């Protein structure tokens, strides 16, 4: 979340930057500043009472030493009154601070200066396109029909077992999933990312730390009996590894990668966007996470974008990179680059990765800090990206590599699959 210092220093700047996200922050900012003023006034009053208590307590000791018990008893009454008032002030301060926190979490992260205003996806900026042109056979099929033709993904069986959005991968389809996961992890670890295998359920503190709670609670699966949430992305548990951590000045960068199943309710999804693998409730994804000093985070972001682009190029797929406009930027992100693959069979672009810099927004929630060269405590910057999300990668691989009688596996994946085609 945004720091109080940021709001105090230039509230108008905060309001203007959040307007780029189409978020009207004025009322919340004004309320936060009012509550912050109350907080400081209550703290000043409380400190004065504590100082007076300490003074009177010393006075009582002196009176007792001089045998002036009656006077000491009168001072004790005064101390008791101060204690009662102190308790009352603490209760007021606690209530005020809870309301202050509740208001602060309503404010999204401010977009960085590279982010332009815009209503939504239609206003995102295409910053790069690459990959080979796709040449499909005459009777090309979308991936859901290819999956049925070659018996590699069973959507109907998933409906029987669970419901829509929970496909069953079979035979070479299952092996392709496993191959992609291992391929992505190998590339990530070769680039210096440490592999971790985190839990796929997290507590509310973890969900709050990375900003999924309360903002995206409606999109998360909740396990009520145990008060856990199924993760929508490995970003949540991996970034929370650093919750309440103080790093040293020389502990950077922190680079981690993880494969996890991911779970998203995706309430309200309908139409062609949900056909086949286009939008699922359970899917596999490999994630990269970095913790950086503020002065290095944008260079790290560029490295992450180049890293993801390198993976896509190795797969030989047509892609484009978008810089999201303010209206399409997530609640927690300061800047995001999306990667999309071209599905010639569907005639549309499929998102496969988002790479984001959250600056200090998540770190402030996580209490993730470091001591700089002068020993001062500073907030870290957090970044993450999909490297990659599997469903739409699989969709594009199947569609763009189809021939009349088979699907050709990209050469880089063959050591992982053990086969060169699906037929």
Model region roles, listed by residue range:
Residues 1-134, 152, 156:
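N-terminal alpha-helical targeting/anchoring segments
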Residues 26, 129-423:
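TRNA-recognition modules of translation machinery and tRNA-sensing kinases, especially anticodon-binding
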């Amino acid at each position: 979340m945004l720091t109080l210092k940021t709001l105090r220093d230039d509230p108008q700047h905060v309001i203007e930057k959040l307007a780029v996200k189409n978020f009207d922050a004025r009322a919340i900012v004004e309320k936060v500043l009012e509550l912050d003023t109350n907080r400081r006034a209550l703290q000043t009053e409380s400190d004065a009472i504590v100082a007076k208590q300490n003074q009177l307590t010393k006075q009582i000791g002196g009176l007792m030493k001089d045998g002036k018990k009656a006077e000491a008893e009168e001072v004790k009454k005064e101390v008791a009154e101060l204690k009662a008032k102190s308790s009352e002030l603490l209760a007021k301060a606690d209530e005020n601070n809870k309301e202050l926190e509740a208001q602060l979490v309503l404010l999204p992260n401010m977009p960085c200066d590279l982010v332009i205003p815009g209503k939504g996806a239609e206003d995102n900026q295409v910053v790069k396109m690459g990959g080979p042109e796709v040449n499909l056979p005459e009777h090309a099929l979308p991936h859901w029909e290819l999956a049925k033709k070659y018996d590699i993904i069973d959507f109907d069986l998933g409906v029987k077992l669970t419901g829509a959005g929970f496909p069953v991968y079979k035979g070479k389809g299952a092996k392709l999933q496993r191959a992609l996961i291992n391929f992505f992890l190998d590339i990530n670890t070769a680039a210096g990312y440490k592999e971790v295998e985190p839990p796929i359920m997290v507590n509310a503190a973890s969900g709050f730390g990375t900003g999924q709670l309360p903002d995206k609670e409606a999109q998360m699966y909740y396990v009520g009996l145990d008060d856990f949430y199924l993760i929508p992305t490995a970003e949540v548990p991996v970034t929370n590894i650093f919750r309440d951590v103080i790093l040293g000045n020389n502990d950077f960068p922190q680079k981690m990668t993880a494969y996890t199943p991911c779970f998203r309710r995706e309430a309200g999804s309908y139409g062609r966007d949900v056909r086949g693998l286009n939008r699922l409730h359970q899917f596999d994804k490999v994630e990269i996470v970095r913790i950086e000093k503020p002065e290095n985070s944008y260079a790290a972001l560029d490295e992450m974008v180049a890293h993801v682009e390198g993976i896509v190029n190795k797969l030989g797929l047509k892609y484009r990179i978008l810089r999201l406009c303010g209206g399409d930027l997530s609640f927690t992100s300061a800047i995001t680059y999306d990667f999309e693959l071209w599905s010639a069979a569907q005639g549309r672009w499929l998102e496969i990765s988002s790479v984001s810099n959250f600056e200090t927004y998540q770190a402030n929630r996580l209490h993730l800090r470091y001591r700089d060269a002068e020993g001062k405590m500073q907030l870290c910057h957090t970044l993450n990206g999909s490297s990659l999300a599997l469903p739409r990668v699989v969709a594009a691989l199947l569609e763009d590599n189809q021939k009349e009688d088979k699907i050709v596996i990209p050469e880089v994946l063959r050591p992982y699959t053990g086969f060169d085609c699906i037929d």
